[in-house]
Amino acid sequence: MSYPTVSCKLIGIHGHAGSGKDTVADYIRFTRENTWKIPFARALKEACVRLFGMPLESFHELELKEAVHPYWNISPRQAAQFFGTEMVRETLPRLLPTIGSNFWIHRLAMTLNGLDESMPYDSDDVVVIPDVRFQNEYDWIIANGGIIIHLTRPGADGIVGIPSHASEAGILHTCPERTYPLSNQGSLDDLHAKVEDILTEANVYPFDNPDSF
C-alpha cells in the first residue's frame, strides 16, 4: 500500500505524552521562517469538539487533556484516543479499503497538497508534525524524505488516557540515520540547544549552515 507524497520538508516528533513534543515543535516553528506546525490529529481534535462538545483548548493544554468531562465521564485525551484509533484507524478501512489504517496520513497530505481549500505547501516550506504515534506515520515521514526527532523525558512513560492504548505503545526506528534522539531532562535552554544541534546535523535549513554550500 503506497503512501501519498508531499513537496514540503517534514519534521516528525515522536515521544510519550508529556515528553515535550509541542514545546519542541513550537520552538522550531517560532525560530524559523516558512515553518508550520500541523499535527496528524488536527482534524481529529476538530471532529471531537463537534462530537463531544468539548472546548478545543481541552485537546491542547496538558492539564485539560486529562480532566474528566462532567457529562461524558471521559477525558479529552480518551475521546481522541478512541475516536482516532478504534473508530478511524481500525474501522474506517471497511469504508475506505484502499488506504487501510492510513486515513490520518492521507488527511494531512490533503492539507499539505492544498486539496482541502488550504494553500499547498511547497519545497520551501517545513512542516513540523508533533504527534507521530504509529509506525505508518513514522514510515510515511521517512518515505517523503523527512526526519524524526525521538523525544524522551523522565516520568513521561505513556501511562495516560486509556490504559495500554496503542497510541502510546511506541514505534520501531527503522531508519536510524534519519532518527534523532533527544533527551529532555534539563532546562528549556538546554532543550533548545539540542534542537539546534539536530537541525544543523540534519541540514533541514541549509541557509542556516554555510558549510552546506
Language-model regions, residue ranges each:
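Post-Walker A helix-loop "phosphate-sensing" segment adjacent to the P-loop in P-loop NTPases
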Residues: 30-37
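Small-molecule kinase domains that catalyze NTP-dependent phosphoryl transfer to phosphate-bearing small molecules
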Residues: 14-17, 135-144, 150-213
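Hydrophobic positions on the alpha1 helix immediately C-terminal to the Walker A/P-loop
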Residues: 24
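Short, hydrophobic/glycine-enriched beta-strand segments
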Residues: 9-17, 37-39
